[in-house]
């Protein structure tokens, strides 16, 4: 899995570098790249979010998914201006490979909070037409289930 992680990271970095006219690095191949996969690509600068775009479901080949999400995070995240060439050396790229979403069964909010596994679970929160998503790394900033869910609900506008 570490080898696949390095390949995905190189694909993401290469997609951004190529769009900016910068040199790219050699990248290996893996059968997993040709199977459907879902990724999120997160860009940070000095610990601050700079872009994050991804796919919640696997609907295209994994290699294509990571490249497209890297480009979208760098150049089309509506929260930020497009990444500039001068920013690239200071931009950290992270690729999250998602597993298929699983529905949670719970009786109330306390039951839902008790089922969450800090540092492991990402959550897709949906109520009516409101929806928000947190990846597992968000637990680093919101370490308790109560904080995690409160911010997730706020992000959904609830």
Explain the meaning of each model-derived region:
Residues 1-158:
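Basic nucleic-acid-binding interfaces
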